[in-house]
């Protein structure tokens, strides 16, 4: 567990290359370490290596199909690649597992909004806020969606 803690500390300090070395060492010894797979994927995503990060999320999901972090983060990477329907499928899968996942609701709202479905997106932002009232992404996005709907 020390290497995972060390990798986390490196990420917090913005030293992603060193964090990736830690994850590689963990995965060399334990290729099925779900935490290391998801955290490595997240680190790669933070570095803008989206397609590679998605591959690591998929490895983690093969081992643990109900991993909420892997599902929502994979959805986020797909969203960044503008693959909104694929992203929404990830969020829907996460919501089947955890009906109170504010992040999945908010992120689904973002993907819907990018598809021009502001009215539907607004419902998801409101749901995210009903679960987590101080959720910044949902609040900001809700306000933007409302403004867009007023301008139509």
Language-model features and meaning:
Residues 12-13, 46-47, 80, 114, ...:
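Register position in tetratricopeptide repeats
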